[in-house]
Amino acid sequence: MYPTSHEHHLSIHENSELKNIKPQQKVLGCFLIVLSIAFSDVRDLFQIFSHIFLVFYILSLTKIPAKTYLKRLTLDIPFVLFALFLPFLSSENNDKIFEIFSFNVYQTGVNDMFTILFKATLGLTVGIILTGVTSSMEIIYGLQKLRIPNIIIAIMSFTIRYIDVFIDEFKRVKISMASRGYVEKGLKTLIPIAFASGALLIRGYERGERVYLSMISRGFNGNIDFKSRNYKVSNKFNFCVILSIVILLLYKIL
């Protein structure tokens, strides 16, 4: 696998059991788990606790530090804030449960709140698991092995590279502003940030164009090639994926 400077942004380089299994296996497995969570019914306690146990068991296999997990879980805050208002809303049915400070709490709103909290939190946790034990380029490699169209693979690969370009340019702009004595004080100091943002966009675009032209000069023809390496098999991860699908199928059949 080609090493890249952006691999460390999300991936946790630990001796995890899931670190060295095939990327396509991790991508497909996480997708199936998220699919099972998305189609599960929050009114079924067996499904809820089964999926919670499976997801957090897989999380324990990754050996991601709790502090890192909680920090990345903050992406769930907008969904949590949105879900907290749902109990006070109702669809067409006037299914009021009780009243709090002149605000009516409805059963449909409570159900929607638990649905969002359950699915969004577990879905994000699965995403944290995947990105924690798989580098960005390995994810693209796994998608390529899953026969995703080459145009999508190329777009994702360029996106990752250009994000890294913009991060580097942002660091340079920040250092240059600090060397010129820039200090953030009040709204007036936001004007230099606006100018710097425009310059950052232009410089990032120019650098991205140079990267693309250099790839063309080296024989790039639109196909992304990756070097494969030896991977291991995790029976525990495979069992959790299969069990997640079985739980969903049993609920749909029964």
Cite the ranges covered by each PLM segment.
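Juxtamembrane/interface alpha-helical elements of multi-pass membrane proteins
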Residues: 72-183
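Short, aromatic-rich membrane-interface segments at the entry and exit
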Residues: 43-50, 68-72
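Hydrophobic transmembrane alpha-helix segments characteristic of membrane transport
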Residues: 50-57, 138-142
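Membrane-helix interface segments
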Residues: 44-45, 65-66, 148-152
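Membrane-helix interfacial "entry" motifs
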Residues: 15, 19, 63-68, 100, ...
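Transmembrane alpha-helix interface motif
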Residues: 1-43, 53-62, 168-254
